[in-house]
Regions:
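Short loop-beta-helix segment that forms the pyridoxal 5′-phosphate
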Residues: 274-279
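Short acidic donor-binding loop at the edge of a beta-strand
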Residues: 302-305
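Short conserved active-site loop signatures built around small residues
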Residues: 285
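Active-site signature of alpha/beta-hydrolase-fold catalytic machinery across serine-
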Residues: 291
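Active-site histidine-anchored catalytic micro-motif
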Residues: 288
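Conserved "HGTGT" condensation-loop signature of ketosynthase/thiolase-family condensing enzymes
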Residues: 1-226, 230-273, 294-297, 309, ...
Length: 635
């Protein structure tokens, strides 16, 4: 019997705010929401960014004694929190764009004579003295160095960064302050927050989820595309020796790209189930989603946590992408607009006249189960993932240039949609969440992929969205951003337009596409499927078929029957209320992420092992050792 992978929880954080309860999505369509939804999201941003606290029924601004109602709070802070989100100027908390470190190597020669004399602390002397140095003691801590002839020095220097905008997490939000972060890289701090948000959004305690399945039928598939490259991870590991700092014992292990999965297992779930971390550049999230979907469809797993977390807004990473010609530079934006000052809120312009992508950061997570487990739990159904297709590009010249693999993945995704729901649904009730990076190359190549697929399947005016216009490009987690926004479509009926553009570029292939700045008003059941599209450096292409909750429920009724689905409604209402309670606590700034350091650490002595099973303390079900012979016909 088939297994449908359904989404029972989702959460995270990016430039639009908290993901659960659709708050991040709401930020993109804020002016089109009902009053209460708009107030709730602005309130959530106010407390998330530490601009307000909640006490005894009222909100308080920092340093003020007068309590405010929710309406009063949002009236005062609404514009501030909107300005503190989405793509905007890089804040000094990340780094100072006016003082980007770029030290200079200089050859120093004596101004007169053959020698240069300098004084320094003795402990600052290099271990290996140059041959032309003579050192004499001045006092207990000071030495004089006489240098014969020229010597080389690295002089501290800075310059203004050519790129000064990014899709950062909301200003004032500090994930390290929410738990004992112990000098964790920013990426992993975001992981703890994002995965906790997703788990809490289910409205079901993890212990209950865990008790429904055997330990080995759980999995966590998560990673990022470039590892942890800030000071606390690989960034510090690589540059500390050359800047006079020591390498710490944490920088090496905490820099690995699979650490988001490791942290979730070790500090949130205590899971001993399957674990994996696929890497596929900008398609990384969908690669991990594919592993989860295939596991559930095949019956190998019942419950999978899928996620990604990328924090690439560091001076070195930004400069690396800039020198590739990939990022939108300030002077290029000025040239596009014919002005002297770059519009740092509109740096990302997918499918319009553009000059490069804008960096973003994000942590996105979903809780995926089989339809059978979701039914048994009475879980909320937010959507379903019918399949994820992955293909390479074939032979290349430049390793970073796009190739033909994306034609294969998107065509397969369209074909699967048609096979499940029919040609009419594909043609009239599907849309595409494009990779949409805002580079000149992407606007041509990806639009051609989507347009040719539309032609092949008889689709006219295929709606195309591109959330990087709002959020920037969060690298390996970008597919998670696309998925999270798509789930909001089925709650509020609005597919976000590409609001940063005022025209579609003349070289975009759009004869069969609908690309526009305005939002698409489609209704909560007007779209059956969203095709998520990702393209990554090196030839990493992935396309996923995401189906709406109304479609997932219809398929589940067909399999389990109407009565079984009706019987789960009571449990769904309970879990929905628990999720709403969590959302309310979060909006008030009263919830903290899960972080269980040193909790219930087991050793081999704690296990009960016999020929038939392994019993693990804390799990209601044992691991079954009745393994069938997969090569019976050969034995």
């Amino acid at each position: 019997m088939s297994n449908l992978p359904v989404i029972i929880g989702f959460g995270g954080i990016n430039a639009s705010g908290r993901t659960s309860s659709h708050h991040g999505y709401r930020r993109l369509v804020l002016d089109h929401l009902d009053t209460q939804s708009r107030l709730d999201t602005l309130t959530d941003l106010a407390t998330l960014t530490n601009k307000a606290t909640f006490y005894n029924g009222l909100f308080y601004l920092a340093g003020e004694a007068q309590g405010l109602t929710q309406t009063q709070l949002t009236a005062q802070l609404g514009d501030q929190v909107k300005d503190a989100t989405l793509i905007r100027p890089i804040r000094t908390e990340a780094y100072d764009v006016e003082k980007l470190v770029l030290n200079k190597v200089a050859q120093i020669v004596p101004a007169s004579g053959d020698y240069t004399c300098i004084r320094m602390r003795k402990r600052h002397l290099p271990n290996q003295l140059p041959d032309n140095w003579q050192v004499s003691q001045i006092d207990g801590d000071t030495v004089e160095v006489t240098i014969s002839g020229a010597f080389t020095a690295i002089l501290p220097d800075t310059k203004r960064a050519p790129v000064s905008a990014a899709g950062q997490l909301p200003d004032g939000f500090d994930p390290s302050s929410l738990y004992q972060s112990r000098n964790h890289p920013r990426n992993l701090q975001m992981t703890v927050f994002g995965a906790s948000d997703a788990l809490s959004s289910t409205g079901i305690a993890w212990q209950i989820l865990q008790d429904h399945v055997a330990p080995d039928r759980i999995a966590v598939y998560a990673s990022n595309s470039i590892g942890q490259l800030d000071e606390a991870g690989f960034g510090g590991l690589l540059k500390n020796p050359s800047t006079g700092k020591r390498i710490t014992s944490k920088q090496m292990p905490l820099g690995y790209g699979q650490m988001p999965a490791d942290f979730v297992n070790a500090y949130l779930l205590g899971s001993v189930g399957a674990v994996g971390s696929a890497l596929g550049a900008c398609a990384t999230f969908l690669y991990n989603l594919r592993n989860a979907v295939e596991d559930i469809k095949s019956g190998r797993r019942d419950l999978v946590i899928v996620g990604g977390s990328d924090a690439p807004i560091t001076p070195e990473v930004m400069e690396g992408f800039r020198t590739m010609g990939a990022l939108a530079e300030d002077h290029e934006l000025c040239a596009l607009d014919g002005g002297n000052e770059a519009d740092l809120r509109r740096t990302s312009r997918p499918f319009s006249t553009n000059c490069g992508f804008t960096m973003g950061e994000a942590s996105q997570w979903i809780v995926l189960t089989s339809d059978t487990l979701a039914l048994a739990l009475g879980a909320q159904i937010h959507g379903a993932v019918a399949g994820v297709f992955v293909n390479a590009d074939g032979h290349k010249k430049s390793i970073s240039a796009p190739g033909i693999g994306n034609y294969v993945t998107l065509a397969k995704a369209a074909a699967l949609t048609e096979s499940i729901l029919g040609a009419e649904s594909l043609r009239h009730r599907s849309c595409v969440q494009a990779h949409g990076t805002s580079t000149p190359q992407n606007r041509i190549t990806e639009s051609h992929v989507i347009n040719e697929t539309a032609k092949a399947f008889g689709i006219k005016d295929w709606k195309v969205a591109a959330v990087k216009a709002y959020l920037g490009h969060s690298q390996g987690t970008a597919g998670g951003d696309q998925l999270a926004v798509s789930l909001g479509l089925w709650r509020y009926g609005i597919l976000p337009g590409i609001a940063s553009i005022d025209h579609v570029a003349s070289d975009v292939h759009d004869s069969h596409l609908a690309i526009q700045a305005a939002h698409h008003e489609v209704g909560t059941e007007g779209i059956d499927t969203v095709l998520l599209n990702s393209k990554g450096f090196g030839g990493n292409n992935a396309s996923a078929v995401l189906m709406g909750p109304h479609v997932a429920n219809r398929l589940m009724v067909k399999k389990h029957g109407f009565k079984a689905m009706e019987n789960m409604r009571s449990a769904q209402e309970t879990h929905n209320q628990a999720a709403n309670d969590y959302d309310l606590q979060s909006m008030r700034g009263l919830s903290n992420p899960t972080y269980k350091f040193g909790h219930n650490v087991l050793t081999g002595e704690d296990l009960l092992i016999n020929r038939h099973q392994i019993v693990i303390p804390g799990y209601a079900k044992a691991i079954d050792l009745s393994v069938s012979n997969p090569f019976e016909d050969m034995c």
